[in-house]
Amino acid sequence: MEGDDTPYSAYGRYYIRINDADIPMESGQLQRFFEEKESNYSKWEEAETDYGPDDINEDLLIECIRTANEKGRLEYVYRNANEALNKLGLLTENGKLNNAGLYLFGNKKPLTIKEANYPTDDRSEFGEIKEFRGNVFECLSEAVSYIQNHISYRARIVGVQREETPEIPIRAIREIVVNSFAHCSYAKKGDFHQFAIFKSSVRVYNPGPIIKNTDPMKFASGLVGSKIRNILISSTLFKCGYIDAFGTGFDRAFTLCANAGVEYQYRNDDF
């Protein structure tokens, strides 16, 4: 047989391609596919790299451990990088960083993100395009700062003070950016986070949709619980206070936008 057995979606259904024919997938087949994908992705996080505890940003690790203790999400006093990384599940039995540890704290700039600022609502002309490289925490901070520095602000005078209000609530921006790093598919080669500011919108793209194609609107409404692709990465983000354990980040972001009169939209691409 010829063709690719990886399913694709069209008109609300999933299909596989066999001998030039589009075969609809049954629900049981689709469930097994997603379960296999989830299992394989956990193996990616746990896979050993060529790097060790000396190849991390130790100051960042110390700060994360301190924050985790302050928030009551970890009971551990930092003594050394090796012990702390083990505590977070980020070292292999051979004392090497796994992929999750490298991407979270590595000083080898494992991630590349792309940022752009467009003066109109299309890509025909741009004011700035740049790339930034770093680990998850560094790229996350850069993305939030970039958006914050390029969106518009409304100003008013209160007494003798000038008050500026961002067109999009900064807390909502942070929630969406953090979730993009928590839920993305890091194993996808040649794909990058993209953060683009247009005249009337901000667009955040991350490689891969939420696991099992879950609609984040269902997270926000409480119809489904939190679903995690990156168990080790998300666990560390939770301990450090970047995300919570119940998938309420989307609800906060959507509520903040609604209260500020900001329209929002989410599109879930194929798994």
Where are these regions (language model features)?
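Glycine-rich phosphate-binding loop
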Residues: 226-256
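Elongated alpha-helical scaffolds
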Residues: 1-11
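Conserved short secondary-structure elements within globular domains
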Residues: 1, 254, 258-259
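Active-site helix-to-loop segments that bind/position phosphate- or nucleotide-bearing substrates
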Residues: 5, 17-191, 195-226, 249, ...
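A short beta-strand-to-loop motif within the catalytic HATPase_c
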Residues: 266-268
